[in-house]
Regions:
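Short beta-strand elements that form the blades of beta-propeller/WD-repeat-like
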Residues: 72-78, 120-126, 162-176, 215-231, ...
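Blade/loop signatures of beta-propeller domains
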Residues: 12-53
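Repeated scaffold domains used in trafficking and secretory/extracellular systems
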Residues: 63-66, 108-113, 150-158, 205-212, ...
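Short coil/turn segments at the loop-to-beta-strand junctions that recur within blades
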Residues: 57, 98-105, 146-153, 199-204, ...
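C-terminal motif of bacterial Sec signal peptides marking the signal peptidase cleavage site
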Residues: 5-6
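Conserved blade-ending motifs and adjacent loop-strand segments that build the rim/top face
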Residues: 242-265, 301-329
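Blade-loop segments of beta-propeller domains
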Residues: 54-63, 83, 92-119, 126
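Asp-box/WD-like beta-propeller blade repeats and closely related beta-sheet repeat scaffolds
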Residues: 108-110, 125-175, 196-200
Length: 380
C-alpha cells in the first residue's frame, strides 16, 4: 500500500502532482490482505494528529456543519449558531469570519461555506441566493452580490478559478418543491449558469454524497449516486463531456478478483457514498458499509484496487458518527463529538491492548462540555 505523507508539490494549477521521491511506503503482508485493513493498525503514530478546539464563551462549538483545511488553519462552520470560525492547527481560535444576522453584510442562512484558494477568501452561499467573500486573513467582507439564478438555491459549490464556479442544486424556493430534474451548472461572477446539465426523471434523485462533485485537472467530475456516472466539464471551454466510469454490474475500477465490499455498495446503488476524490495517479472512494467507514484506493494506471481500509472507530457496540474530509487527496480528517469520545474512553478503559489510534483516544481529556475533536491523518 502506498501512503502519501504530504508529498504534493504546491504549484499553480498543479496541486495534485506527487513527488514520489518523498513518498513513504508501508509493506503489507499478503495474509493481511485476506481481510480489510484497519487503518489505525498500520499508520505511523507520528503521522496522526489530534486537535482539540479550545473553547471559551466566544467559540463554544455546536453541530459541525462543515470543516475545511486551509493553509491558514481549520475552517469550521457551526450549523447550530450559524457562525464561521478559523482555528489554527493547535486548536486556537484565530478569528470569526463574517457574522450571522439580517443586517448589512451579514449572512442569514448559509447553504455552503468553502475556501477559495485562488483568491484566498472564505465564501458563503446564503439562503438569499447571495454569495459573500471574506478575506481569510482579516475576516473583512470583500464582495457581496447575487451570483446565481435567484429562483434556484445552490446547495454545493466549488471554485474553478478566482471567479469561475461549479454549483449544484435540486430545490426551488419559488415553487417550494424539489425539482424533477436536478440542476448542475458552471457559472462565472454575477452571471447565471454558463452551462447546465439536466438529468431525466429516472435519474433525478437526491444525491446522498457529501460532495456530489470535485475538481481535478481543471475539470469538474460529477458523481450521481444512484446511477454511478461521472460528468466532465472542461473549465476552459465549458463544453460538457459525459462518460460512464463506474458500472453497477462490473465496476470498471474494481478488480474482478478483488473481494472488496465496494461491489456490495454498487449492487445497492451506493446509498451511503461519502466521497470520491482523485489525484494524478489514484482515485479515492469513501463509503459506508454496516455503519463503518471504509475507503478504497484505486490505481488509475491499471484500474485495480490497492486495497480497502476500514476506519476502525466503531469499537464493538459503540456507534460513532464521524465525518470524513478529503482535501486534494492529501489527508483524511474526522470530527468526533465529546459524548462519543466519552463512550469510547469508557470502553477503552476495559481493553488491555490498545491500537495506536485507540491509545491516542484514551489519553484525551474530554468532558460533556468540550468542543469536538478534529483528527487529521497526514498519510493519504
Amino acid at each position: 500500500m502506498l501512503i502519501l505523507t504530504g508529498c504534493n508539490i504546491k504549484e499553480p494549477r498543479k496541486k495534485n502532482n506527487i513527488d514520489f521521491k518523498k513518498a513513504k511506503t508501508i509493506p503489507i503482508e499478503d495474509k493481511q490482505l485476506a481481510d480489510h485493513l484497519f487503518l489505525d493498525q498500520i499508520i505511523d503514530t507520528q503521522s496522526l494528529e489530534i486537535y482539540t478546539f479550545k473553547e471559551d464563551k466566544d467559540n463554544m462549538l455546536g453541530m459541525i456543519g462543515k470543516c475545511v483545511s486551509t493553509p491558514e488553519g481549520i475552517l469550521i462552520f457551526d450549523s447550530s449558531t450559524k457562525a464561521i470560525y478559523l482555528f489554527d492547527f493547535n486548536g486556537n481560535l484565530i478569528r470569526k469570519i463574517g457574522s450571522y444576522g439580517k443586517g448589512p453584510h451579514e449572512y442569514l442562512k448559509p447553504l455552503d461555506v468553502f475556501y477559495n484558494p485562488f483568491n484566498n477568501t472564505v465564501e458563503v452561499l446564503d439562503m438569499a441566493v447571495k454569495t459573500r467573500k471574506f478575506d481569510i486573513h482579516s475576516g473583512e467582507l470583500k464582495f457581496e452580490g447575487y451570483s446565481f439564478q435567484r429562483k434556484y438555491h445552490i446547495a454545493f459549490s466549488l471554485p474553478l478559478d478566482s471567479n469561475l464556479y461549479a454549483g449544484y442544486n435540486g430545490f426551488s424556493p419559488v415553487e417550494e418543491v424539489y425539482q424533477n430534474n436536478f440542476r448542475f451548472g458552471v457559472f462565472k461572477g454575477k452571471n447565471i449558469a454558463y452551462r447546465n446539465l439536466y438529468f431525466d426523471k429516472e435519474t433525478a434523485v437526491p444525491v446522498t454524497s457529501i460532495n456530489p462533485f470535485y475538481v481535478f485537472n481543471n475539470k469538474v467530475h460529477f458523481f450521481e449516486s444512484i446511477f454511478p456516472v461521472i460528468y466532465n466539464i472542461d473549465a476552459d471551454s465549458l463544453v460538457p463531456e459525459y462518460h460512464l466510469v463506474f458500472k453497477t454490474a462490473n465496476p470498471s475500477f474494481t478488480d474482478p478478483d478483488d473481494p472488496s465490499l465496494i461491489k456490495e455498495v454498487f449492487d445497492k446503488k451506493l446509498p451511503m457514498l461519502n466521497r470520491v476524490n482523485e489525484t494524478n495517479n489514484f482515485i479515492f472512494i469513501t463509503y459506508l458499509v454496516d455503519e463503518m467507514k471504509r475507503f478504497t484506493i484505486y490505481n488509475k494506471a491499471d484500474s485495480k484496487s490497492l486495497g480497502t481500509a476500514v476506519f476502525n472507530y466503531k469499537i464493538k457496540e459503540l456507534d460513532l458518527e464521524l465525518y470524513s474530509l478529503f482535501q486534494d487527496g492529501t489527508f483524511l480528517g474526522s470530527i468526533v463529538y465529546p459524548d462519543d469520545l466519552m463512550r469510547v474512553k469508557e470502553h477503552l478503559s476495559k481493553v488491555q491492548n490498545l491500537s495506536p489510534l485507540q491509545d491516542r483516544f484514551n489519553k484525551l481529556t474530554v468532558s460533556a462540555l468540550s468542543n469536538p475533536v478534529f483528527i487529521r491523518f497526514k498519510t493519504i
